[in-house]
Curated annotation (Swiss-Prot):
<feature type="binding site">
    <location>
        <position position="39"/>
    </location>
    <ligand>
        <name>a divalent metal cation</name>
    </ligand>
</feature>
<dbReference type="GO" id="GO:0004309">
    <property type="term" value="F:exopolyphosphatase activity"/>
</dbReference>
<feature type="binding site">
    <location>
        <position position="91"/>
    </location>
    <ligand>
        <name>a divalent metal cation</name>
    </ligand>
</feature>
<comment type="function">
    <text>Nucleotidase that shows phosphatase activity on nucleoside 5'-monophosphates.</text>
</comment>
<dbReference type="InterPro" id="IPR030048">
    <property type="entry name" value="SurE"/>
</dbReference>
<keyword id="KW-0378">Hydrolase</keyword>
<dbReference type="GO" id="GO:0005737">
    <property type="term" value="C:cytoplasm"/>
</dbReference>
<dbReference type="InterPro" id="IPR036523">
    <property type="entry name" value="SurE-like_sf"/>
</dbReference>
<feature type="binding site">
    <location>
        <position position="8"/>
    </location>
    <ligand>
        <name>a divalent metal cation</name>
    </ligand>
</feature>
<dbReference type="GO" id="GO:0000166">
    <property type="term" value="F:nucleotide binding"/>
</dbReference>
<comment type="similarity">
    <text>Belongs to the SurE nucleotidase family.</text>
</comment>
<protein>
    <recommendedName>
        <fullName>5'-nucleotidase SurE</fullName>
        <ecNumber>3.1.3.5</ecNumber>
    </recommendedName>
</protein>
<dbReference type="InterPro" id="IPR002828">
    <property type="entry name" value="SurE-like_Pase/nucleotidase"/>
</dbReference>
<keyword id="KW-0963">Cytoplasm</keyword>
<feature type="binding site">
    <location>
        <position position="9"/>
    </location>
    <ligand>
        <name>a divalent metal cation</name>
    </ligand>
</feature>
<dbReference type="GO" id="GO:0008253">
    <property type="term" value="F:5'-nucleotidase activity"/>
</dbReference>
<keyword id="KW-0479">Metal-binding</keyword>
């Protein structure tokens, strides 16, 4: 089994190292990750700035680009082979609900999916790296069990997986979930620069809004691993009929 691993926290992030260490003895693993933290870069590609591939002392390769750049370059010119699985993470903090729209971790996994490869985005729920080894072991077990079920190397699929920051034995079983929703993000943070200009920092993510039973928020709050299948199609299929009536009345020719 050949696995490509990326992340959005950067090639030196503990979560990336832990995921690699957990899988290196059971698969042929290659790491291609961003040089710097690229959180919230979603699916962004770098189109107007040259990028360079460098080799770290531990063998990881890193690129001065986004997570999606890293996977794109790896799959279209760097590796020289097609991996069986693309993994992203382990992210430092949750990617649940609306987070998935912004997440560079999900964006990296989605880039693999767009190239027809099964992909998983792994995240820990809290941002303190606590019990990271447990999360990495759970990620390893999930990958191995999926391999045993012949799901890897098959037709493409995309999964978002959030793992609670608990000990290995405290983490409950996997629950298949839908995405929840967050409230709108908190207000921007303003500061005055040494030159007197106003600086703006994006505020923290909003708290959970839809955390009902069946959501990723609910599952992880009970100690479960939340697993959500994702898709790329953003079409609102339920409202196509409504908008068809409106579109029929528009005269823009």
């Amino acid at each position: 089994m050949k696995i490509l691993i990326c992340n959005d926290d950067g090639y030196q992030a503990p979560g990336l190292v832990a995921l690699y260490d957990a899988l290196k003895d059971v698969a042929e693993v290659e790491v291609v990750a961003p040089e710097q933290n690229n959180s919230a870069k979603s699916n962004a590609l770098t189109l107007h700035t040259p990028m360079y591939v460098c080799r770290a002392s531990n063998g990881f390769r890193y690129i001065n680009g986004t997570p999606a750049d890293c996977v794109h370059i790896a799959l279209t010119g760097l590796l020289g082979y097609r991996p069986d699985l693309v993994l992203a993470g382990i992210n430092n903090g949750a990617n649940m609900g609306d987070d998935t729209i912004y997440s560079g971790t999900v964006g990296a996994a989605m880039e693999g999916y767009l190239f027809g490869i099964p992909a998983i985005a792994f995240s820990q729920v809290e941002k303190n790296w606590s019990h990271l080894a447990s999360a990495a072991r759970k990620a390893r077990d999930l990958v191995l069990q999926m391999s045993q079920q012949d799901l890897i190397g098959s037709s493409p699929w995309l999964l978002n997986v959030n793992i609670p920051n608990l000990t290995f034995d405290e983490i409950a079983h996997v629950k298949l979930c839908r995405l929840g929703r967050r409230h709108a993000a908190e207000a921007v943070i303003t500061q005055v620069s040494p030159r007197g200009d106003t600086m703006y920092w994006i505020g923290a993510a909003g708290p959970a809004k839809d955390e009902a039973e069946g959501t990723d928020f609910h599952a992880t709050s009970l100690g479960h691993i939340a697993m959500t299948p994702l898709k790329v199609d953003l079409t609102d299929h339920d409202s196509l009929g409504y908008w068809a009536q409106t579109a029929a009345k528009l005269t823009l020719a």
